[in-house]
Structure formats: C-alpha cells, structure tokens
C-alpha cells in the first residue's frame, strides 16, 4: 500500500472571515476561521489549508493573529498562504504555528525565492500554489496557463512546465487549482491534475471543483493526486470529513480513518 491519501479542507479567508466563491468571485460567508478549522480537526481532517485570498491582490500581509489563534486550537498540519513574498514572511508564519507555507504570486515573479525558501526552511514546508486555466481551443492538445493575483492576471506560463520548474527549485508539494472548476462543483480538471501529477516527483494536491464525494475519489484514482482539497462541500454541511473518508475507503482509496 502507498501513503494514505489526504483530505484537506480549505479555508479561503477574506478580512478575517471564511468565504467561498465561484471561480474566485461571488463570495458567501462561511464563518470564523478558528471555529471552522477546529471543527475540521475534530472531524478527522488530515490537514487544513488557510489562504488569505485578499493578501496578494491588495498587497496586505497574511493575518498572523488569526494563524496564531488557529494553531493554538488545531493539532493537524496547517498550511498558510496569501501574501508570502519574502523569507521573513515565511519565518513569521512558521513562528505563528504554521507547518507549511504556500507561495503563489511571489513564485511567478521571483522563482529563485522558492529555492531560497527551501534552502532556508526545508522543502517539506514549502508548497507552491498554481492557479491554472485551460487556454487550448477544442481539438487542440490541452494546455493550461498560470494566473496570479487570485486568478486575475495571466502570465503566459505553461502550468505543467512551471510545476516541474518549481519542484527543481525546491517545492516540496504542489497545490494545483483549476480556475475553470473553482466552486463550480462539477469535479476536478482531471486531465490537468493527471498531467501535473505525472510531471513531478512531489505530492500534488488537487483543488477546484469538488461537488460530491465521487469527485474526491476521481481526483486520486484518475487524477493521480496525493491529496484532495475541498471547501464548499464541507463548509456548508453537505458532507462531513468522516463521510468523505468512509466513501473513499469503500472505493478502495487508502485514507487515515
């Protein structure tokens, strides 16, 4: 048996509240981040990802205070992203109680930053977040482009090539979000997930599009993901973490029960 596949609830945090939108817009409130994280920890989530979704866009640093509160209440690994631009930001987050940091926009502008971060803090705590959109026309070979600033700015970078490059620089994990699928609840972009999973040697977390428990299974079995990330199906009570794990186990996916 390989390593157990992880289920990771994602908390998109805007001005201190957990929110969830569709394709990065049309936002709904989902509660206090510390309360939400605590609930997932108690339910048996494998990890929590906390993304300050306004940080990169508005040039505001991630809310250290919220991370400290969360880390004091949550005992599973915590990944924090949003506005991580320099080594000092990483140190601050790790000191606040984060186990890993997620770098997105800064990695695109200064890829060397990922290398410096991995050298200083270790690859195991450096996650590179990739927001990708399909740009190929029907009938063409499938291509995906990287977007930054919460999905607002195209970069011209190919997602698969970029993922490989980030791992060469020292990323210990790739958090891969399909922006076409984000919040749409029609499943992960499995072709994208599989292409990146096959291209890199580090764990890939599939994100964007979970609408039911079968989608989680598909992300692992068809997409080749090592972990699956979801937000709205958990935040709004459609499914619980134990239900998700039981369903995945029944479908032959190894999970930590």
Swiss-Prot record:
EC number: 4.3.2.10
Cellular localization per UniProt: Cytoplasm
Gene Ontology process terms (BP): L-histidine biosynthetic process
One Pfam family named in its UniProt record: His_biosynth
InterPro entries with a match to the protein in the record: Aldolase_TIM, His_biosynth, HisF, IGPS_HisA/HisF, RibuloseP-bd_barrel
Keywords (A to Z) from UniProt: Amino-acid biosynthesis, Cytoplasm, Histidine biosynthesis, Lyase
Annotated S-S bridges: none
Active-site residues per Swiss-Prot or TrEMBL entry: 12, 131
The keyword Cell membrane is annotated on this UniProt entry: no
Recorded GO CC terms: cytoplasm
Catalytic activity as recorded in UniProt: 5-[(5-phospho-1-deoxy-D-ribulos-1-ylimino)methylamino]-1-(5-phospho-beta-D-ribosyl)imidazole-4-carboxamide + L-glutamine = D-erythro-1-(imidazol-4-yl)glycerol 3-phosphate + 5-amino-1-(5-phospho-beta-D-ribosyl)imidazole-4-carboxamide + L-glutamate + H(+)
Primary role: IGPS catalyzes the conversion of PRFAR and glutamine to IGP, AICAR and glutamate. The HisF subunit catalyzes the cyclization activity that produces IGP and AICAR from PRFAR using the ammonia provided by the HisH subunit.
Family listed: Belongs to the HisA/HisF family.
Quaternary structure and partners: Heterodimer of HisH and HisF.
Protein's name according to its UniProt entry: Imidazole glycerol phosphate synthase subunit HisF
Gene: hisF
